[in-house]
Amino acid sequence: MATARPPWMWVLCALITALLLGVTEHVLANNDVSCDHPSNTVPSGSNQDLGAGAGEDARSDDSSSRIINGSDCDMHTQPWQAALLLRPNQLYCGAVLVHPQWLLTAAHCRKKVFRVRLGHYSLSPVYESGQQMFQGVKSIPHPGYSHPGHSNDLMLIKLNRRIRPTKDVRPINVSSHCPSAGTKCLVSGWGTTKSPQVHFPKVLQCLNISVLSQKRCEDAYPRQIDDTMFCAGDKAGRDSCQGDSGGPVVCNGSLQGLVSWGDYPCARPNRPGVYTNLCKFTKWIQETIQANS
């Protein structure tokens, strides 16, 4: 677990690094960032202390992916959405329930010890009647995951027990069909709602985005895109970002992608979010769950 530092230190770190580099940096959904070790890839896991109060500036030790210019999700509409927590109430990544005892998240969200919260709408630690709490007992990143290249950015997490299916907690199917340009999708998460400032929402945020052609994706990020990724966004500057990493991209009722990485600051014109392309991994997901159940 990374050591918590004052929030101003991380803001100052990000600003100084940006000035020194003189270029726009890429944001990952959750690697720890340190001023002692500047990197061209800025992590975007949230590590927000939920006890600090929803909507306040981050009390975190790294950056995190978030929903920029989204809106409050309707309650009970994202029952597969999970929060990965460090300590009692520190959000660091999103995840998706894909099986009664298994989650998918981004491989760069891997931690040794963490808790999982499902069925919760607010970012606050206050108990909600639909919530279910779990321990993550096994994390299995894809064997082809590479950092900082971000290829194959997915990981399976086994829960310590099966979920109790309710209106607030249920799995979603992973799509076996790859998305086409123009497909309308929805991304959700509790990540920061401003960039480069850090400001966390009170409740789960949702955003409608459109899948872009692979050419537009490659043009936006030359020599950084492969077929394990796809880009999505819109012209109005709406995007996922820090704190949303590992969260779901749902298209036509199925799980199509996971929040992976993107530009920093987020929600910049012609710099879309980049998502793990799950249609390429359905066999690995099924076989891994079967082999470890």
Curated annotation (Swiss-Prot):
Main subcellular localisation: secreted
InterPro entries in the cross-refs: Peptidase_S1_PA, Peptidase_S1_PA_chymotrypsin, Peptidase_S1A, Trypsin_dom, TRYPSIN_HIS, TRYPSIN_SER
Subcellular location: Secreted
Regulation: Inhibited by Zn2+.
Annotated glycan sites: N69, N173, N208, N252
Protein purpose: May be involved in desquamation.
Protein name from the UniProt record: Kallikrein-5
